Amino acid sequence: YSFGL
């Protein structure tokens, strides 16, 4: 899982 803005 990865999250980036």
Swiss-Prot record:
Keywords from UniProt, A to Z, are: Amidation, Neuropeptide, Secreted
Q: Where does the protein principally reside?
A: secreted
GO biological-process terms attached to the record: neuropeptide signaling pathway
Q: Which GO terms describe its cellular component?
A: extracellular region
Known function: May act as a neurotransmitter or neuromodulator.
> What is the similarity comment for this entry?
Belongs to the allatostatin family.
Q: What is this protein called?
A: Carcinustatin-14
